[in-house]
Each structure stands twice: as structure tokens, then as C-alpha cells.
Amino acid sequence: MNTHGFTLVREEQLSEVSGTVKLWRHEATGAELLSVLNGDENKCFGATFRTPPKDSTGVAHILEHSVLCGSEKYPVKEPFVELLKGSLQTFLNAFTFPDKTCYPVASANLQDFYNLVDVYLDAVFFPRIDEKCFQQEGWHIEADSAEGPLRYKGVVYNEMKGVYSSPDSVLAEHSQQSLFPDMTYGLDSGGNPEVIPQLTYKAFKAFHESHYHPSNTRFFFWGDDPEERRFALLAPYLSRFTARETDSAVPLQPRLDVPRQLEFPYAAGEDGDKGHVALNWLTCETADTGELLVLEMLEHILLGLPGSPLRKALIESGLGEDLTGSGLETDLRQTFFSVGLRSIVPGTAEDVEMLIMETLADLAENGVPAAAVEAAVNSVEFDLRENNSGRFPRGLAAMIRSLATWLYDGDPIAPLAWEKPLAALKARLASGEKVFEDAIRRWFLDNEHRSTVILTPDANLAAEREAAEAAKLQRLYDALSDDDHKELVALTEALRASQQAPDSPEALAAIPSLTLGDLPRENTPIPKTEDTAGDLAVLAHDIDTSGILYAEILFPLDAVPAELLPLVPLMGRSLTEMGTSKRNFVELGTLLASKTGGMDASPLVATLRGARTPVAKLCLGGKATADKADDLFALMAEVLTDADFDNRQRFTQMVLEERARLEQSLIPSGHGTVITRLRAAYSLSGRISEALGGVTYLEAIRALSDRVVSDWDSVRADLEILRGLILNRQDAVLNLTADAKTLAAAQPYAAALGRALPTAFSVPLPLDPLGAPINEALLVPAQVNYVGKGCNIYDLGYNWHGSAHVITRHLRMGWLWDQVRVQGGAYGAFCSLDRMSGTLAQVSYRDPNVEKTLATYDATADYLRKLDLSDRDLTLAIVGAIGDLDTYLLPDARGAASLARHLTDDRDDLRQQMREEILGTTRRHFTEFAEVMAEAARAGTVCVLGGSAAENAATAHGWNISKVL
């Protein structure tokens, strides 16, 4: 069978993807296409190139950014951004892996999907990639004047500076490289900031020429779109190429016969005295799908639960505070396993290594408990059947899975067809074969291809790196002639002029986009009924969930005093991680994994529409197959009514884990920390969120880590107070998502859960008013900054209108993108508006600047005043806003979204009104919003998380300074 030059190689019906999978080969070029035909309306496409680098200059990563900066058919500066501005896309991005670069798109709108695919195809095969693009996205030297200092700039350069500021990222990179010393995985495909400036434009261009060819491409389609059109989209591009050999093969790393130990410094704070260690093993090839499934289950057995033997041994050892390491890494040709401890005392790495090996030896010798095996099998099988890819489209998850073999010229269908390997593994286990004990010996105990990677703290490293970079640039400056200096200034000015020059109307018109007429005028409501069961208020959502029941029960936090709020997240964790009077935490975790798809508790905070009062809940959520609904509700009742808070050692471990997790996430997620901090200054719900997950929470957890040692009785008493204040039937809400039959069958179990809850009454406490906001710098040992400025626009007199969503989205994708990312060199910038509370924040991500970015924020009003918005730009902004409103949600997320709307009184009629206001947005709304942004500039509050640049700005302006790491 041949169509559009493609020949069918293989076809299979796969229940695992609910459809047909076809492998096609393009005869003229050798390009392969994996075409999945099923009923998923969230259509997905991807083009993947094998791109193993030969150095750590980040060439593949910089090229990934750059091909999306203009192409032959779409000659605008950033078609990627134009698509983001005005598409109904459900996914639009690109990824650089150690050996491949992927360009995936997804949309539930057919015409929009075709538009995205065409722009991406032109981008990857016929990109502009001129020298200015390379300088902007990769690196360049910036000089404002012939006498002034030189600076390295570039989006990827600053992105990777941020990566190398995170100890977790550094440890992960060194762990991978330590196992692959002889091939491409021993390099950094993302780019090492110290090496990136060695990349030349010539080498950059050559990499595209050699790797971005159909002969080196794997195409992927997924969804309910007609297959014939898939070929028609690809054919015009492939017709311009002929087959050729591409030097992109990824070899196997030869097996090492001697373990390695490597030690590296990392940038710690002034008080940082803790190290990190990871033990790493090279394991099987991804082509061995049966063995890979064994390793996935073994990972769950060893680490998947709080009471898993290796996790438990490491945490209870007291050698560190939390696990580190990626576990099983499956994105490369050869998999590897990594596990270790964060925050160890320097010099104790060998103790950690010995403990890991002894624990594994004990399991191999004495056997893996049968209950742990059952839990692992159930958990892995549940995940496979649920196919819950979260924020990623299911098609994208399938594409990544297929590439595990396909990229290396293996069978792309095998990783998708998991039913037979699963059945075979179950049969082996049923026969009594010691599958996991044998795997422990084979891959861990008898495997000499392993490494120990140690990170040691260095409080001077960040400053030394800055000084080394400054000295390098000074030497370069000193070596330049006067004419060279002038030329460098001219090049800087030319790049800025190019960045600031608008695209022509003709070029912009070439970008395909939807019209307002293509947009649905009505919102699609989520099914919801309200009822009671056992005196418990119940929300039910009749949605096809493929036989899975999702359940969440929520309890108000209104009666919790402010001083106890930071204890709520750990109290929630305690429900499922400390055991009950019937079973200890190991037994409870194993039972949960055997009977359900998971259960956990966490806070939920939002703002009530109109009243601007907080909605704060503790949410216990779980999921199970329909036939195990009784187990799900029985276990929910058990943890809610019988959780055991007496285990001091276990609770102390949880506190230390929480502290380590918070500290390690500060730098990688600095923008989130800044947004949370700004919202806390301007809304009561924001203040509660900060107490439950921000810097205030980190400070409270640090204090708690001392108190569990010095005054456990008071901590135990506080946990009991929280139990009494929170876990009762009063105002509790049960949220259920499943098909109608499953919902009906669950009613008796829901009623029993309601009856099991205490009937105590808690009195809501009045909330203290917000204090005066303060400008502040939060100092961390990072080479980049996260710069924020925020306010509450309702306090400034603004009344909500749906056009605000259109305007802030336009600012994010236009003004801030151009000024902060393109010209400023930051990795990203956001304009975040919470319509319920009124808090607005402009925040940057991995930003080399502070003052310049703040000046951009303050100039937003002037930008809006002068904005000459074309009809096209207005339409794009409206289309993009509707895309946000209609974001594609998997079944469980639809039920959760309906719950959130119910709790905040975000009614369907009001959401429809907002939709109409979005669709009716005009230029006048942009002009009027300029005055809101002018007030935001005048009255807003600054929060910057960063290193020396943040400290210098804070000192100059008299901001409050706090060292948080």
C-alpha cells in the first residue's frame, strides 16, 4: 500500500491505545511515520530528530530554540510566539534530550491542528537561523559602549545558568555523565554555561544541515483526524529532499568493570554545609521491553512508597534529609537507575553507599515481601490502564514512549503494546519465579557498571564563577583594539535594532490563524449534580473515566489559627504516611498501593468570587478501579478517623524531607516563589497559600525541624488540635468523578464514609487584615534572578471584565516576551492575573537583569497607551484567551475543575458572560487598561529572588533583604 510516497510497513490493532497503529516509510527519503488512529479529539503531532552532540556547547538545545524563530514560508521573527498568541493549542513546545530533539504540537480543533503542524514542518526543515537568531537564542557578547563592560547574553545561556545553579540538576547531570564516559550521554546536550561561548555560528549551521533532514526524522500522528490528510501535510516538505546517510547513530556505552567515584562542588549559601550523594547503575536497553517493565516495578518496590525498603532505610538512617536521584531513567538508549540522599554531612557518602548495597543485598537474600510485589504490580498496571498523562496530551506521552526504541532503529510499536509483557511478567510471578530478587542481583549487586557521585558545598563557588566570567570578559576587552570595541558596540546595536524592528504586515499575514468565526460561542459545561450521602454533601460528575472512580473529600480550614496553618500540609501527609491503629505506615502504604491508584492529602486554596474571601480546604483524594470502590472508601474512612500521629521518628523524617524539598525547589521554581510572595501581600487567600507553601512555610518548617527534637509533645498536641478542628462532617464536601453506573454503585460507600466522620463543630476564626506590602529581595546562591512586581487591581478601582484576560495574555506573549526574553535575555516572563482575588503580577524567569526588567514592568502602561493594535493582533489575543478558557482536560481534571468552580461560586452563567466579554474585547479595553497598569507601576510591590544582582538592587533601593538559602 502506497500513498503520497509512503509505504505501509506494519499495522496493528492495539487496545492499549484504543485504536490502530500503522508504521509507514517514505520511500524517497527514508523518513518514518508512526500513525495512531483513535477517537482522541486532542490530536497530536511530533517531528523528532536524532541529535547526539559531540560537545557541551548546547548546539542541539540552541538549535531547538532557533528553528522556531522564522522560516521560509513563515518569515516572521518568531512564528512560535505568533502561534502561542492566537491558537487553541493544547500543547506547543519543543524538547532537547541528550540524544534527540522533539517538536510536538496538539490541538482539539482540526484546522488549528493543521495550522500548527504546517508551521512546525516549515520551521524544522527550512528555518531562517541567521546569525542574529543564533546570538539571541544562543549567546553573544553585549557592549553598550566602547568604554563599558562586556556581558554574555543569550536565552539558552541564561537558561543553563539557572540549571547549573540548582544542586539537584547538577547532581542529575553528573550522575548521567558518570555512567557514559565514552559516548554522547557523557556530554551536556543542554549546554554548560562555561562551554556555550565556544559554539560558533558555522558549527551551529552545520549541525542543522547534518541532522535536520527527513532521513533522520521520525514523524508521529495521534488522534481522530483523517489519516489521508496526515500524508498530505508531510508530502510537500518531503518532496524537496532525497535520502542520504546521516551520522547520528547513538552507540551503546561499553560496560565498565570497575565502579567509579566522582566528586564535584556546588554553589551553596553562606551557611550551607551539607552535601548530596547519588549511587548510579547502568541497567538494561530500552529495547528490552520485558526487562524494562521488571525495572519499573522494581523501582516501585524499592522507592515508590514511604515504607518501601530502600527509601525507608535511607530516610531512617539519619544520614541525610530526603531522597535524591531520578530513580529509573528511561529516556536514553540504555536505562540507568539513580538513588541517594540530599543534605548529608560531608564525609558520609561511603556510609550512604554501604547502606544502599546492604539493603539491596538483604532483599536479594531474604526476598521481596509478597505484599510489596502485589502493590508494585497493581500500581504499575493501574498507571498503564489509566493512561493519565496530566498536563501532557496522551498522544505526546505515547510518542515519547515509542521513541524509547524507535529512535535507535527498533520497533516503535513494542513500547505501546504493554499488555503481553505485563501478562508474561504476571505469569512468571505466579509460577514462583524470584523475578525481582534476580533483578536486584543482576542490575545492582553484581553490576560493576556503577558510579557514586558526590556534591560538596562551596559557599564561594557562585562568587568565584561570577569573578571568573568577569575576568574572562575583561581579558577579552583588553585584547580588543579601539576599532574592535566600536565594532562590538555596533553589533550590539544591530542586534537590538533587529529585535525591536516589527515584522511586516505581509509576513505576519502568512502565519495561519483562526478567525473569531471559528470559535465556539458557548462554553462547554462540565456535568455536575449535587446530592447528599450519609449527611455528606456530594458533587458528582458523570464522565467516562474508563472504569476508574476519582474521589476527593474536602474539609474547611476556617477554624485553624494562623500559627497552626503551616502544620496543615504535614498533617495532611500524616493521614496516609504515618499509619493507623490497625497498621503501621509501611503496611498502610502497601495496602493503598494494592487496592487503589493512590491516595494523598494536600491543601487547596482559592478565593470566593465577589467576596474576595479565602476558600481554604484540606483535600484527601484517591482513585481506584470501579470494582475496588469499596476498598477506596473504606481506606479513606480509616485514615480520616484513625490516623496515628504518635510516631515521632516518622514525623521527624517527613519534616526533614519537606525542608529539603522546599530548599531544593527554590532556585528551579523561583518564579513560583515570587508570585506566591506577591499574592500574599495583596490577598487573604494569597497569604494563606504562602503560609502553606511559600517562604513563610519554609521558615515554619525550619523551626518545626528544631521543635520536633526539643518539644515533640507540643507538636503532637498541635496535630491533635488540627485533627479536631478539620476532620469532621461539618461543611465537608465529597467530589466524585466517574460514569453514571460507577457513581450509582459508589453511593452506599460514600454514605458510609459520611457516617464514619465525627460530627464535631468548628467555629471559623476571623482573619487578620493584610499588612502593608514591602519591597524585598530573597537571596539564594544563583547566577540568575526571578524578578517580580505586583499589586491588587481591585484595590486600584478596577472592576473585572473578561477583556483583562485578553490584555494580560497579550502582554505576556508580546510586550514582556519581546522586552524581557528577546532583548533582555531571560528565559521567560509572565503576566499573571487572578480574577477572583484581583492580584496581578509581572514576573521573569532565569533573568540576568533586575533593574532593566523592573523598568520594563513600569513601562507597560506607556506601551498600552501607544499600542496600535491591528485587527489581526486583536483577533489573535482573543483566540488565545478562548484557548486558555477552553483548555483541554482529562476526565479527572474535569471533575477537579468543576469542584473548584463550585467552591468559588464560579458559576456557568458567569463563565459564559466572561466568554462573551473576551469575544467582545476591543482596542478601547486595551487603552483603558493602561491606566490600571500605570497605577500598578506606581503602587506595586517588588519581590526579587536571586543572587548578587538582587542584593545590589535591594541595597540601592532600600528594600528588605532576606537570605532564604
Residue spans of the language-model regions?
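Non-catalytic terminal extensions that flank enzyme cores
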Residues: M1-C44
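His/Glu-based metal-binding/catalytic segments typifying zinc-dependent metallopeptidases
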Residues: L37-G39, G46-T48, Y157, K161, ...
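M16 family metallopeptidases and their MPP-like homologs
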Residues: N42-P52, E78-F126, C133-E142, S169-E194, ...
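Active-site His/Glu-centered metal-binding helix of metallohydrolases
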Residues: V59, L63-V67, M571
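Generic recognition of flexible, low-complexity loop/linker segments
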Residues: F91, K205-E209, P265-A267, T324-E329, ...
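Hydrophobic, small-residue-rich alpha-helical packing segments that form membrane-like cores
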Residues: E142-A235, T242-Y266, D271-D273, A278
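Non-catalytic, conformational "gating/processing" segments within enzyme and secreted inhibitor domains
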Residues: K205-P236, V715-A750, R938-A939
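Extended, regular secondary-structure scaffolds
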Residues: R218, E227-E245, N366, D446-H449, ...
